[in-house]
Amino acid sequence: MNPRRKKRLGIILAIFFGISATVGLMVYALNQNMDLFYTPTELVNGKDGKKPEVGQRLRIGGMVVVGSVSRDNESLRVSFDLADVGPKVTILYDGILPDLFREGQGIVAQGVLKDATTIEAFEVLAKHDEEYMPSEVAEAMKKTHEPLQYTTEQKEGNAQ
């Protein structure tokens, strides 16, 4: 093999290994940031025949059980139960809860599984209807906006 071919082969191999290393690092990073979504029933009973491992990062969504919210008087630590149609899962959270958080409300918590039915959350998101409007905004709109009056032609549209 002449020197020119050796140089080309070296360049091609360097490019190949560089691309392979880049793809490998990307897959590793995506794996580390991937949080699987579970409901409380799926967490306890398993999802597709597989239960998450203790220490695994995950997201869980469900309804906050009425009467289960417990706040620590000394800190921002809160614990509450989350349920869907089956078993309950306890969520432990240290931080300020969203304004829309309340008992009976849907939430999504992101955290780490501590044991089979307990999650140490580092983020809690309150779910709400897409038509949600803060009461202050609704009152202001009632005062300044009159409801639109449609004619029968406008209500029927372009139906021909």
UniProtKB/Swiss-Prot annotation:
Residues noted as binding heme in the record, renumbered to the chain: 128, 132
Topology term for the membrane: Single-pass type II membrane protein
InterPro entries: CcmE, CcmE-like_sf, NA-bd_OB-fold
Regions that span the bilayer: 9-29
Periplasmic compartment segments: 30-160
Gene3D superfamilies according to UniProt: Nucleic acid-binding proteins
Compartments (UniProt record): Cell inner membrane
Primary location class: membrane
Described function: Heme chaperone required for the biogenesis of c-type cytochromes. Transiently binds heme delivered by CcmC and transfers the heme to apo-cytochromes in a process facilitated by CcmF and CcmH.
Annotated protein name in UniProt: Cytochrome c-type biogenesis protein CcmE
Organism: Vibrio atlanticus (strain LGP32)
Lineage: Bacteria, Pseudomonadati, Pseudomonadota, Gammaproteobacteria, Vibrionales
Gene: ccmE
